[in-house]
Amino acid sequence: MSPMNAFDSQTEDSSPAIGRNLRSRPLARKKLSEMVEEELEQMIRRREFGEGEQLPSERELMAFFNVGRPSVREALAALKRKGLVQINNGERARVSRPSADTIIGELSGMAKDFLSHPGGIAHFEQLRLFFESSLVRYAAEHATNEQIDLLAKALEINSQSLDNNAAFIRSDVDFHRVLAEIPGNPIFMAIHVALLDWLIAARPTVADQALHEHNNVSYQQHIAIVDAIRRHDPDEADRALQSHLNSVSATWHAFGQTTNKKK
């Protein structure tokens, strides 16, 4: 009997154990769409289709792979999620290059689910603190005069938005975005944008009046961060940033407690 036949003829009771409790069993068969996806991905990575080039039409792909339209569409959708193709209505899929945003986008669903678990927000706030702490230290040591001017402009917009909560949130995000831009690393930018999006989405709804005092405190803390960066003092910039983010975390935690009591 061949090894394959011997494998196939094993019963559940006689099959060898793998690890502690697992027993050998046939691997699940791949869907047609997964096979099409893998083949197209390999063709793209081998440069058979270059960046910006259109893939064959759905009908041509159906004929080439001898599969139905649903399999082709599922395969193209999977490639889009990987950032390997762009799909616009009425046009053939076009080859693209994955970006840092593609990577973060794939994590978004898992991140939002994690945030909904007990302690999830605190873990992400700690991640943000560690991340931005490195950013401000880098900024204090390496920021150019032009980059410091951009921080000052973001700070000015911040000051003009104190009485408008929606505008202040936008200016607050923009201020921290300018910080994240200073190293010139697109992965840092993608991580930072995603972190803020995830955390802001998880915050409770708070009345505008309750936010006004918080806005003023945040603005003053932003000033302290910029002043330390302007003096090229990484230790002071780090202290100012940590004071700011710890204050923000405590404020939103208090808002959340108040909101829960009202429910």
Swiss-Prot record:
Pfam family for this entry, one: FCD
Domain of life where this protein originates: Bacteria
Region of interest called Disordered, as start-end residue ranges on this chain: 1-24
Native source organism of the sequence: Escherichia coli O127:H6 (strain E2348/69 / EPEC)
Record-annotated membrane-spanning stretches: none
GO annotation, biological process: negative regulation of DNA-templated transcription
Start and end residues of each HTH gntR-type domain: 30-98
GO molecular function term, any single one: DNA binding
Protein name, per record: HTH-type transcriptional repressor NanR
Alphabetized PANTHER family for the sequence: HTH-TYPE TRANSCRIPTIONAL REPRESSOR NANR, TRANSCRIPTIONAL REGULATOR, GNTR FAMILY
Key words, A-Z: DNA-binding, Repressor, Transcription, Transcription regulation
DNA-binding region: 58-77
Function: Transcriptional repressor that controls expression of the genes required for the catabolism of sialic acids.
Family: Belongs to the NanR family.
